[in-house]
Amino acid sequence: MIKIIIGVVVLGIVVLFHELGHFVAALWCRVEVLSFSVGMGPVLFRKKFGKTEYRLSMLPLGGYCGMKGEQAFQTALDQKLSRIPVEPGSLYAVGPLKRMGIAFAGPLANVLMAVMVLALVSALGSRVHTFGNRISPVYVYDSSDNSPARRVGLQDGDTILRIGDQPIRYFSDIQKIVSQHAQRALPFVIERRGQLMHVTITPDRDAHTGMGRVGIYHYVPLVVAAVDAHGAASRAGLEPEDKILAVAGRRVQHAVQLLALLKEFRKKSVVLTVLRSGKRRYHTIALVRTENGAIDVGIEWKAHTVVIPGTSFFASVRAGIAETLRMCVLTVKGIGMLFRGLQFQQAISGPLRITHVIGDVAQHGFQESFLTGLSQLCEFVALVCVSLFIMNLLPIPILDGGLILFACVELFMQRSIHPRVLYYLQFVGFAFVALIFLCAFWNDVNFLFH
């Protein structure tokens, strides 16, 4: 319940920031704002200052900015007018350039919010938990896998030292580079049993995410960092710093190998050989299977903790801008991938899933430490802000990008667009957005139930 509340509040703040951008720009352009609400739904409190009524509404789902003249378009349709009626201080009383500015200000507020939260992450520093640069290919434990790792012959225990001109220390380094280079050849330097090897790997494009993948797991040594208090490992008596050596007498070296071996057993329990304080011990662990047949042992493996120090004010602002630009580029590429084989229905998420993920990220991060939770939450919020920035600027009627497009056409033609033409364009835009929303809602429902 807590993570749902966190998700709703954070997503609401992101949407409110968007509306605040429209609000400030409207006042700057001398367009009267009749109402500005924090929250949606029934109004709990209202107070008028000047010409604007400020409201506090019941549902913390963002807010809205009501400008004078927004309904003039409907008036023109009802009265079958050839132009949208104009009154002083209304939206259509200002020129197309100012209307473009008002429409652009909402998405701009979101991208500025992304810069601010990412600058905060850089200023505070962060801790990243990751594993080393040794890998375990998926195909070794899944015969149906035909990933690039199999095609180039990567082996269990290989160590990736370099990709292109980038040195590799951690598995997260591999993920970052590979994910951004789908279907682009990358030179790898690999160490295998003391020998250096040079191979070229072209990551496949994942049909669900659009990101590159080569088909590898991280090679995780079997040293226990923590056990789930209600899990099988805890009931078997395993403790932090234990090292698992064997399963039913068969030697194991890393986590993927362990889980694959446990999955083979049809018994209800199995004996683990464990090294604790230099002495061998034997623990019988129950084999608890998940819905998809995987084994859940309730163990968190010991990882590397990488401490990223905080930066100065100006350095953090530069880092915030650079990371926001990187996110913008990746988001635009992701939209382009929708037309190049990416599974559209699986690639979009709606507010339910976004809310759930925000809350999940925050809850797990804050359980580890305040700094980790804040950093992870800020990074995900920045991603949501960038997504709203890009999506709202798409030239689709009823979105901010559509309003900007109409203003550009009006500026070029030196006359306003006929209300009936606007109506048909907005109807098409509404149908398109509604279709996307239905797909996102369906994906959200499937996500929550599975």
Swiss-Prot record:
It is a multi-pass membrane protein. Keywords: Cell inner membrane, Cell membrane, Hydrolase, Membrane, Metal-binding, Metalloprotease, Protease, Transmembrane, Transmembrane helix, Zinc. GO terms for cellular component: plasma membrane. It is found in: Cell inner membrane. It comes from the Bacteria. The chain crosses the membrane at residues 102-124, 384-406, 421-443. Zn(2+) binds at residues 18, 22. Belongs to the peptidase M50B family. NCBIfam families: RIP metalloprotease RseP (TIGR00054). This is Putative zinc metalloprotease TP_0600. It comes from Treponema pallidum (strain Nichols). The lineage of its organism: Bacteria, Pseudomonadati, Spirochaetota, Spirochaetia, Spirochaetales.
